[in-house]
A protein has these predicted regions:
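Alpha-helical scaffolding within the catalytic cores
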Residues: 1-8, 34-43, 75-79
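Generic alpha-helical hydrophobic packing signal
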Residues: 30-34, 38, 56, 85, ...
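N-terminal-biased segments
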Residues: 26-45, 142
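Catalytic His-Asp segment of secreted/periplasmic serine-dependent ester chemistry enzymes
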Residues: 59-145
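Oxyanion-hole/transition-state-stabilizing segment in secreted/luminal serine hydrolases
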Residues: 1-34, 61
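Active-site segments of SGNH/GDSL-like serine hydrolases
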Residues: 16-20, 43-76
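Structural recognition of the beta-strand scaffold that forms the well-ordered cores
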Residues: 11-17, 52-57, 91-94, 114
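Glycine-rich phosphate-binding loop signature in dinucleotide/nucleotide-binding domains
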Residues: 5-9, 47-48, 134
Length: 145
């Protein structure tokens, strides 16, 4: 997927990584997380399309079956993302705070990791604003009758 994204020559690149990295079996490679993120950024910066690159903080996760650890997200991953965004002078989109107190059925599906329609809408509104600099238009539910 990473190679295909480069070949696509994007105008905008949204990097939202880290949630699955917080699992114990993945976070044992935590020393590589920052350098891998920086590699992705520098690789996209070399694209002929000169894309706008946006880094996103991880969304919160609550008790879940997958081993995703919110304390790793808040104490380690999100600070790394913030530092890397600052180092490369990139926009950092905070997706954590808008969902921090909504890790329940209002914004998440039953597993407390994946977003439902409401949570996805919040995420989309914040990313839209990061790309355009404007407030997202009121979106209509395509499945509503």
């Amino acid at each position: 997927a990473f190679i295909n994204a480069q070949k696509f020559q994007p105008n905008v690149v949204i990097i939202k990584l880290g949630t699955n990295d917080s699992k114990p079996e993945n976070w044992k490679y935590k020393d590589e997380f920052e350098t891998d993120l920086e590699y992705m950024i520098t690789t996209f910066q070399k694209c002929g399309s000169k894309p706008k690159i946006i880094i996103c903080r991880c969304i919160p996760a609550s008790n879940n079956l997958y081993g995703i650890r919110n304390e790793v997200i808040t104490d380690e991953i999100n600070p790394i993302q913030k530092n890397v965004a600052r180092k490369f002078h990139l926009k950092l989109v905070d997706l954590y705070s808008p969902l921090e107190h909504k890790v329940d059925s209002t914004c998440y599906v039953w597993d407390n990791v994946h977003l439902n329609k409401n949570g996805s809408l919040i995420l989309a509104e914040h990313i839209y604003k990061a790309i355009t600099g404007k407030k997202a238009p009121k979106l209509r539910d395509p499945f509503a009758k």
